[in-house]
Amino acid sequence: QAKEEVASDFTLSDVKKEFLDKYAENARSLLCSGCILAADRIGDELGARNASGQPDPPALLAVTKEAIIEACDGLPSPLIVVEGGKKGSLHFEEPHDSALEHLTGVELRRSEVARRSAHRLCRVLLADAKLAMLEVMMRHKVPHARRHSSGEALHDNWERWLCARRARLCKRSEVVDDDEDDHEGEL
């Protein structure tokens, strides 16, 4: 069976409002954390499907659609909200194996709510970014188009591209900073 294409009947604004309602003053840090989780997952799924090695745009589109579905459906379960980082902000985290057996029934239910929130955010972000991601990946394959402008993913840094530049859910200081001043080493 072919999986259904990722389509959303809700928007990023809807998800932001949902996070604000559920998580109040922690909504911003959890939106950023959820975006980083989605970016990490899409990077893994695109890599697993050899997206950069696809021969033509239709093949790349098909692989990207599969990767988006699997990136979101494959989010960790359970997924918990933990305090940590800067100023005690909250973030999503997969519990360690040793912590799994100590989760209470209430904590397990909370973890399912957290996973549903992260899943919805993932679907909205990646469905919205799908065509822009394709453009970036195709441009990356064309030697004369490898000059990167603001908003493009360098070296497959989907975290910075998706979370800080495109969706603007994270500050630049909150995402991986491996694409700065790295243009000299490109082929």
Residue locations for each model-derived region?
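Extracellular/luminal segments of secreted precursors and ectodomains of membrane proteins
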Residues: 3-187
